């Protein structure tokens, strides 16, 4: 019965994204189109180079563009019309490569139509993008090999798949050691009742198949990923009275998380780290997640998990890392040495962000009152 239900959901989602939706404006919630922090200049410029039709058919719920992408091999799960793939392909450069996989044939056809357009737009000798018509929970069937990618991204798609554990398991399989799954998706404040989980429109709107947010950490640990790192979160609003009635007291949030795959070797205690600076678009400051922002040349105390991730990932050359007690060279500036409470709840982060926005009053310099000053 479960297999039959999953197949029915899959068919409904294909119909919704292949035939019902024609543009992002057709969506009935903001669940698939929200973003929660400013977009760096180099990404804005890359977005402007994406063909208009590709951008029009974009249904993602965030901007899944992590940092330090030069020469990386990236896989986009549920690539749709290819918007994120084409942005990423420009950022990884000619020595990098981006593969997009999507189960909706019409979306893949839109994406493939503009391969030459973007290759010429970027001035590349050959296209560094490949699109595959396939299923994100069956990457092996699509020919994607073990440990073949540096980064896996996904933009508001995993919620559309009934077997989320299988999707995460496959992402883990194809990632290299030190690799990262960086993805935006929709999460719920509680376990969803049957009425929501079987509602066709809510499935298509990324709500019916949303994961209870606490379950992500359970699945990540089961598969072997490091604990999820919350990056951004934004509360979802419903613009349809009938859908509001069905949803009732359940709340939804679009959130970006990063999951790292690394060996268990590395620092076993808290460390002090210094960001060397220089990452494209983040030369002076790297907002790693909701809990850690690293400024160039500044000492920051981190927990052992964060230290291990920095040491074993593509960020290894961007940081000086020393166990607490060993002296770090520094160019001066502030020292943020106190570990704060780690935020893991996307609803808490979204509410805090909304509260800060409501209290924010532009000052004469265009900034906000009440914001912390850097020393």
UniProtKB/Swiss-Prot annotation:
It is found in: Cytoplasm, Cytosol. The keyword Thylakoid does not apply. Its main location: cytoplasm. One of its GO terms (biological process) is toxin metabolic process. Keywords: Cytoplasm, Methyltransferase, Phosphoprotein, S-adenosyl-L-methionine, Transferase. Gene3D superfamilies: 3.40.5.100, Vaccinia Virus protein VP39. Changing residue 173 to W: Frequency in African-Americans 0.008; not detected in Caucasian-Americans; enzyme activity is 31% of wild-type. InterPro entries: Arsenite_MeTrfase-like (IPR026669), Methyltranfer_dom (IPR025714), SAM-dependent_MTases_sf (IPR029063). It catalyses: arsenic triglutathione + [thioredoxin]-dithiol + S-adenosyl-L-methionine + 2 H2O = methylarsonous acid + [thioredoxin]-disulfide + 3 glutathione + S-adenosyl-L-homocysteine + H(+); arsenic triglutathione + 2 [thioredoxin]-dithiol + 2 S-adenosyl-L-methionine + H2O = dimethylarsinous acid + 2 [thioredoxin]-disulfide + 3 glutathione + 2 S-adenosyl-L-homocysteine + 2 H(+); arsenic triglutathione + 3 [thioredoxin]-dithiol + 3 S-adenosyl-L-methionine = trimethylarsine + 3 [thioredoxin]-disulfide + 3 glutathione + 3 S-adenosyl-L-homocysteine + 3 H(+). Signal peptide: none annotated. The modification Phosphoserine is found at residue 335. It comes from the Eukaryota. Belongs to the methyltransferase superfamily. Arsenite methyltransferase family. This is Arsenite methyltransferase. It comes from Homo sapiens (Human). The gene is AS3MT.
């Amino acid at each position: 019965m479960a297999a039959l239900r999953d197949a029915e959901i899959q068919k409904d989602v294909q119909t919704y994204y292949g035939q019902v939706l024609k543009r992002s404006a057709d969506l009935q919630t903001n669940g698939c189109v929200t973003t929660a922090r400013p977009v760096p200049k180099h990404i804005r410029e890359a977005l402007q180079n994406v063909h208009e039709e590709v951008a029009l058919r974009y249904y993602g719920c965030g901007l899944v563009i992590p940092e330090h992408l030069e020469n990386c091999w990236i896989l986009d799960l549920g690539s749709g019309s290819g918007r994120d793939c084409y942005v990423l392909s420009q950022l990884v450069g000619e020595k990098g490569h981006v593969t997009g996989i999507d189960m909706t044939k019409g979306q893949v056809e839109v994406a493939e139509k503009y391969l030459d357009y973007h290759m010429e737009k970027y001035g590349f000798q050959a296209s560094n993008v490949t699109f595959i018509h396939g299923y994100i929970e069956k990457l092996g069937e699509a020919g994607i090999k073990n440990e073949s990618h540096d980064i896996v991204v996904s933009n508001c798609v995993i919620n559309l798949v009934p077997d989320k554990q299988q999707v995460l398991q496959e992402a883990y399989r194809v990632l290299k050691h030190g690799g990262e799954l960086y993805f935006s998706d929709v999460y719920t404040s509680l376990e969803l009742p049957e009425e929501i989980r079987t509602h066709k429109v809510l499935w298509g709107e990324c709500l019916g198949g949303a994961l209870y947010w606490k379950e992500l950490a359970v699945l990540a640990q089961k598969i072997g990923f490091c604990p999820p790192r919350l990056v951004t979160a934004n509360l979802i609003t419903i613009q349809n009275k009938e859908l509001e009635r069905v949803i009732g007291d359940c709340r939804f949030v679009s959130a970006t998380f990063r999951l790292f795959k690394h060996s268990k070797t590395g620092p076993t205690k808290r460390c002090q780290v210094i960001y060397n600076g220089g990452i494209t678009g983040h030369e002076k400051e790297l907002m790693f997640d909701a809990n850690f922002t690293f400024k160039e040349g500044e000492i920051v105390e981190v927990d052992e998990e964060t230290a291990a991730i920095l040491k074993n990932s593509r960020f290894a050359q961007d940081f000086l890392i020393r166990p607490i007690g060993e002296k770090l060279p520094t160019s001066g500036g502030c020292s943020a040495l106190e570990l704060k409470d780690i935020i893991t709840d996307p609803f808490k982060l979204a509410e805090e962000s909304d509260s800060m926005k409501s209290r924010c009053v532009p000052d004469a310099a265009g900034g906000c009152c009440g914001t912390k000053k850097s020393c």
